[in-house]
Amino acid sequence: MNGLPATEAPGGAGCALAGLPPLPRGLSGLLNASGGSWRELERVYSQRSRIHDELSRAARAPDGPRHAAGSANSGSAAGPRRPVNLDSALAALRKEMVGLRQLDMSLLCQLWGLYESIQDYKHLCQDLSLCQDLSSSLHSDSSYPPDAGLSDDEEPPDASLPPDPPPLTVPQTHNARDQWLQDAFQISL
């Protein structure tokens, strides 16, 4: 994405995720500064968007000496109009770039939150699977020897064992991140 090969990405080595290209230089520094926390990343993003909004407001305001010089030369043919058109085109381009950066940061925050949720869900499923495997191996009939020399009068050894415990349940966690994801994607967890 940043035009550099994956091996030469500065600052992106610690942030590279399996199967994803390295982050661009600007975003990798931002992610390193935040320690990888999407909440911190969102806070930094909101600060940056406020700064960009202030800069775009300042760019829209006429700057004193240049504006005055342009109005003094308004009598000449096409000379002053070109810089004004060029300045307005640059200002529009700058505004569009700021909007795209804000959209990129918003999407990055959403993707990072989604990535964290997927990782949490995978770990939860792995833990649940491990517990179920362990539970089934402890309570399966194959764990006892098939007829350990018992006569027909004796009870099988599993009759004296307590009944199987209820199936394991995973507690549902609902925090602000989960609620934010549900609202953002309208899915139920």
UniProtKB/Swiss-Prot annotation:
**Chain residue ranges for the region called Disordered:** 54-82, 136-175
Q: Where is the composition biased (Pro residues)?
A: 159-169
Positions annotated as LRR repeat: 86-114
Q: Name one GO molecular function term.
A: transcription corepressor binding
Keywords for the protein's UniProt record, in alphabetical order: Cell projection, Cytoplasm, Leucine-rich repeat, Phosphoprotein, Receptor, Repeat
Q: Name one GO cellular component term.
A: lamellipodium
- Which residue ranges have biased composition labelled Low complexity? 68-79
Enumerate the InterPro entries for this protein: LURA1/LRA25
Cleaved signal peptide residues: none
GO biological process annotations for this chain's record? Answer: establishment of cell polarity; negative regulation of SMAD protein signal transduction; negative regulation of transforming growth factor beta receptor signaling pathway; positive regulation of cell migration
Tell me the superkingdom of the source.
Answer: Eukaryota
The UniProt entry's sequence similarity note says: Belongs to the FAM89 family.
Output this protein's name.
Leucine repeat adapter protein 25
Q: Origin organism of this chain?
A: Mus musculus
